[in-house]
A protein has these predicted regions:
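Tubulin/FtsZ superfamily GTPase core signature
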Residues: 1-158
Length: 158
């Protein structure tokens, strides 16, 4: 039986930041020099994606958003992730564990995170969601979006 190299003995862990809030979380982890993890940023907003420190970036929903973001609409974020599900699956292939981080309440994070979680789990990865909720001052619409999206995500993660 051949011996495995050191890199083969560790779980392949990926952290995927979805939308603005998720990308901010990934940036903080990278700046804190978290090791042993691959970072990916996913966004519908081309400008925001350029600001990400993540070495792997996936722009989703170009046909729907033309790179201009989801405009706070989770249904656009969902459709964007569905449109580019193959790009997402390619980035997550062979992952042992996937952490999905997103801010709930906006468009891309709220809508795309459940789709990405479903892709990761269907590929056999242990799938964990880590999300933030909006502040009270952000309003009822964002709070309702966050509640609905968090419930959808809860059903797609382990």
């Amino acid at each position: 039986m051949p011996l495995r190299s050191d890199s083969e003995n560790f779980a392949l862990i990926r952290v995927i930041g979805v939308g603005g809030g998720g990308s901010n979380a990934v940036n903080r982890m990278i700046r804190a020099e978290l090791m042993g993890v691959e970072f990916i940023a996913v966004n519908t907003d081309a400008q925001a994606l350029l600001q990400s420190d993540a070495p792997n970036k996936i722009r989703i929903g170009d046909k729907i958003t033309r790179g201009l973001g989801a405009g706070g609409d989770p249904s656009i974020g969902q459709r964007a992730a569905e449109e580019d599900s193959e790009k997402i699956a390619d980035a997550l292939r062979d992952s042992d564990m996937v952490f999905i981080t997103a801010g709930m309440g906006g468009g891309t994070g709220s809508g795309a995170a459940p789709v990405i979680a479903e892709i990761a789990r269907d590929m056999g990865s242990l799938t964990i969601g880590v999300v933030t909720k909006p502040f009270t001052w952000e309003g009822a619409r964002r709070r309702l979006n966050a509640e609905k999206s968090a419930e959808l995500l809860r059903d797609k993660v382990d």
